[in-house]
C-alpha cells in the first residue's frame, strides 16, 4: 500500500476546472492529488521574428511556481533576476509537447502563449502542466474555430503526461507524489498522444539502475495512466474534443 492508500497502478484524483481565469482565451485549473496548476492559453496575432512571412504559427510556454507552493518558501525567480535551469527545461518541454500535436500551418501566423503557474506542488508539476496546458490550448483554439478565425481545427491529436517510477519496496508505481518522488530509485516522466505515440521520455536512476523489462513495465504503466487522463480531457472539453477527433 502506498503512502496515500493508492494501488501501484492508480492515478491520484484528477480534476480540470475550465475557465478558471476569465481573461485568457483558454484557462484550466488542473488538480492532480495535492498538485494544483493554473494553465492559461493566450492568443496573439503575430509570430516570433524567425517565423514572419512563413505562414506558420508558434506555441511557446512559460512555467513558474508560487513562493509558497512548496513546504518551505522559495524565492521568486523574478527577484533573482534569472530563470533557473529547471524552469527553462520545463518551459521548453511544455512547448515541444504541444507543438507535436498541432499543425502550425493551419494555425496561421499567430502565437499561442501557454502560462503554467503552480499554486501548490506535491510532485508531478511538469506532467500536470502539460496535461492542463493541452486542455487550455484546446479551449482557446476551439473558440478560434467557433468564431471563424480559423477555418479548421489545427490540433491533430490529444496530449497528456504522467510520471512513473520504481520504489525499492513497492516496485513500479504510477503518478508519484512528492514523498514518493523523493524516495524513488527510478523516476520517469512520459508524454504521449491520443494515438499512443510518445512525445517525450525523461527517465533517470538515482543511485540505481533499471532493466529493459522494468522500462517496458514503466511505459505500460504510464500508458494506462495517460489513457485515463485523455478520457478526462475529452470529458471536460465536450464539443471541442469532438472537433479534434474528426
UniProtKB/Swiss-Prot annotation:
Subunit structure: Homohexameric ring arranged as a trimer of dimers.
Family: Belongs to the RNase PH family.
Protein name per the record: Ribonuclease PH
Catalyzed reactions per annotation: tRNA(n+1) + phosphate = tRNA(n) + a ribonucleoside 5'-diphosphate
SUPFAM superfamilies: Ribonuclease PH domain 2-like, Ribosomal protein S5 domain 2-like
Species, as recorded: Bacillus licheniformis (strain ATCC 14580 / DSM 13 / JCM 2505 / CCUG 7422 / NBRC 12200 / NCIMB 9375 / NCTC 10341 / NRRL NRS-1264 / Gibson 46)
InterPro entries assigned to the protein according to its UniProt record, in alphabetical order: ExoRNase_PH_dom1, ExoRNase_PH_dom2, ExoRNase_PH_dom2_sf, PNPase/RNase_PH_dom_sf, Ribosomal_Su5_D2-typ_SF, RNase_PH, RNase_PH_bac-type, RNase_PH_CS
PROSITE patterns with a match to the protein in the record: RIBONUCLEASE_PH
One Pfam family hit: RNase_PH_C
UniProt function note: Phosphorolytic 3'-5' exoribonuclease that plays an important role in tRNA 3'-end maturation. Removes nucleotide residues following the 3'-CCA terminus of tRNAs; can also add nucleotides to the ends of RNA molecules by using nucleoside diphosphates as substrates, but this may not be physiologically important. Probably plays a role in initiation of 16S rRNA degradation (leading to ribosome degradation) during starvation.
Keywords noted in UniProt: Nucleotidyltransferase, RNA-binding, rRNA processing, Transferase, tRNA processing, tRNA-binding
CDD domains: RNase_PH_bact
UniProt EC number: 2.7.7.56
Chain sites annotated for binding phosphate: 86, 124-126
GO biological process, one term: tRNA processing
GO terms of molecular function: 3'-5'-RNA exonuclease activity; tRNA binding; tRNA nucleotidyltransferase activity
Amino acid at each position: 500500500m502506498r503512502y496515500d492508500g493508492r494501488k501501484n497502478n492508480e492515478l491520484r484524483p484528477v480534476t480540470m476546472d475550465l475557465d478558471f481565469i476569465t481573461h485568457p482565451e483558454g484557462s484550466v485549473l488542473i488538480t492532480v492529488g495535492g498538485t494544483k496548476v493554473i494553465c492559461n492559453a493566450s492568443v496573439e496575432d503575430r509570430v516570433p521574428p524567425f517565423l514572419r512571412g512563413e505562414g506558420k504559427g508558434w506555441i511557446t510556454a512559460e512555467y513558474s511556481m508560487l513562493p509558497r507552493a512548496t513546504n518551505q518558501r522559495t524565492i521568486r525567480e523574478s527577484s533573482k533576476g534569472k530563470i533557473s535551469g529547471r524552469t527553462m527545461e520545463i518551459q521548453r518541454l511544455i512547448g515541444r509537447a504541444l507543438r507535436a500535436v498541432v499543425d502550425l500551418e493551419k494555425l496561421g501566423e499567430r502565437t499561442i502563449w501557454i502560462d503554467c503557474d503552480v499554486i501548490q506542488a506535491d510532485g508531478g508539476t511538469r506532467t500536470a502542466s502539460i496535461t492542463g496546458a493541452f486542455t487550455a490550448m484546446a479551449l482557446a483554439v476551439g473558440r478560434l474555430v467557433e468564431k471563424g478565425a480559423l477555418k479548421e481545427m489545427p490540433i491533430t491529436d490529444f496530449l497528456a503526461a504522467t510520471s512513473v517510477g520504481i520504489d525499492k519496496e513497492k516496485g513500479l508505481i504510477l503518478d508519484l507524489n512528492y514523498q514518493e518522488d523523493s524516495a524513488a530509485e527510478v523516476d520517469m516522466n512520459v508524454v504521449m498522444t491520443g494515438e499512443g505515440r510518445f512525445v517525450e521520455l525523461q527517465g533517470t536512476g538515482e543511485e540505481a539502475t533499471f532493466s529493459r523489462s522494468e522500462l517496458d513495465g514503466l511505459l505500460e504503466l504510464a500508458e494506462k495512466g495517460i489513457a485515463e487522463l485523455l478520457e478526462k480531457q475529452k470529458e471536460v472539453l465536450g464539443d471541442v474534443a469532438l472537433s479534434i477527433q474528426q
